[in-house]
């Protein structure tokens, strides 16, 4: 693992890490913030270990990080899926239910997420980012990830299935 020499460019397109399949090496964006580093590292490590699905790599990162004895690493695991949870909840819940869920999140976590988004948006180029999104969506679909870039958020289905499996296993 190493930081990318192309950090400014990959920050412009919103990429935090990448896996180079030809050299079996992954790189991390040098602009990563401390709470993002562990989850991004384990996500890319999952790809190195052979997991191609972005949802499964997110699930792997979540599982590894949230089981750590280090509280910063655990936090990274939880924080890494917050956006996916909220995006899915907004689509599935009524406005009242969503507001209740959002209100249950500690204010300092919401503030950190807001600052995180501002940090990355200041580096992001919409034109270059849109082109990269389109190309990457085609790349994923060409590699049998039918949902393309939407696959990242499919981690929520994996988490729900895992929690249901755990409940059944503990009966």
Where is each model-derived feature located?
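Helix-hairpin-helix/helix-loop-helix acidic hairpins
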Residues: 15-20
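Second-shell loop/turn segments in exported
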Residues: 27-31, 44-49, 71-72
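Active-site recognition of the HExxH zinc-binding catalytic motif
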Residues: 39-51, 55-58, 62-63
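Phosphate/adenylate-binding glycine loop and adjacent helical scaffold
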Residues: 8-10
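Pan-zinc metallopeptidase signature
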Residues: 107-171
């Amino acid at each position: 693992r190493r930081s990318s020499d192309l950090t400014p460019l990959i920050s412009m397109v919103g990429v935090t890490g990448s896996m180079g399949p030809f050299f079996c090496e992954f790189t991390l964006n040098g602009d990563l913030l401390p709470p993002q580093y562990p989850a991004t590292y384990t996500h890319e490590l999952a790809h190195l270990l052979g997991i191609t699905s972005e949802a499964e790599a997110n699930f792997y990162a979540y599982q590894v990080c949230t089981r750590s004895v280090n509280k910063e690493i655990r936090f990274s695991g939880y924080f890494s899926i917050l956006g996916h949870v909220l995006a899915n909840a907004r689509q599935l819940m009524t406005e009242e239910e969503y507001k209740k869920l959002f209100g249950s999140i500690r204010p300092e976590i919401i503030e950190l997420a807001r600052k995180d988004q501002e940090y990355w948006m200041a580096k992001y180029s919409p034109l270059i980012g849109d082109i990269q999104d389109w190309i990457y969506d085609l790349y994923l679909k060409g590699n049998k990830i039918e949902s393309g870039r939407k696959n990242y958020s499919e981690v929520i289905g994996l988490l729900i299935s895992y929690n249901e499996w755990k409940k059944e296993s503990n009966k």
